[in-house]
Amino acid sequence: MEVFSVFATLSLVDMISGPLDRVRRAMRSVEGGVATLGQRMGNLALAMAPVALAAGVMLGAFGMAASKAMAFESAMADVAKVVNFETQSEFQAMNKTVMDMAGRIPMAADGIAAIIAAAGQSGVAKQDLAEFAEQAAKMGVAFDLTGDQAGKMMSDWRAGMNLTLPQVYSLADAVNHLSNNMNATAPALGEVIQRVGAVAMVCGLSETKVAALGAAFLSAGASPEVAATALKSFTTTLVKGTAMSKNQAAAFRSLGFSATQMAKDMQRDAQGTIFKVLQALADKPKELQMSLLTEMFGQESLGAIAPLLKNMGNLSQ
């Protein structure tokens, strides 16, 4: 019985083996086809990769261009709000001017448009806007400022200090020169002038001398806020005249200065007067210098003013 079972099993295996072989051959054929198809699909994917990459780059470029166009359109809309363009063609001409300028100056068109908006809002005449924008854009590039920042800074100088456009451009050149030759960055110095330039000019300084004195205070390591406070305190003290306190007047008399005469001298030769006062302080014994400075200009300005006594050369930049 067992022998019969074995032979029966072997016979059954023989009967099944043929069909199974055919099935296996068919499966191998399918597997080969699938492998070939997979290989072909892989090759196709490899071939299409550069195309997909190029398409992605193109879509990104189109998206970026669209974004820039929208930013420019928005910026020019702001210009139209503050500048009275009499005709649409006049507005389009300004658009072209801005685009041309963006091709010559490394600043985006919407940044230049922001400068024009700031200038228009501050009262720069329409016929002067293009020149103002070009000068401010160049300043912005040199000072590492955005169009918004450059436009506001230059507009604030002009309006606050009552400067002509040539004076504004000359001031920008002076700030650039000072920042290249002293320990004072152009943005920080520009901010100091924005804060207290008008006050310092009333005290007798020209716009470029305001910049020089501001740079001298900054070079001692003062922040723009501290330097601006020191500049305001220093210059207004020298022109107080009869409004000077008794203790202040006594401190100046100990240096050989009359409060009323000093106020007059500031209007004639502010830079020379400032230099004489600081030189007189520097000539005093060191143990007296800080008490005199505190009495004359106040505690909050010491950090910016005191270092000048050791480096008077900063005042002649």
Task: Report residues per predicted region.
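A short, structural motif
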Residues: 2-7, 11-170, 179-190, 201-208, ...
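Extended alpha-helical or coil "stalk/linker/tether" regions that are enriched in polar/charged
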Residues: 212-317
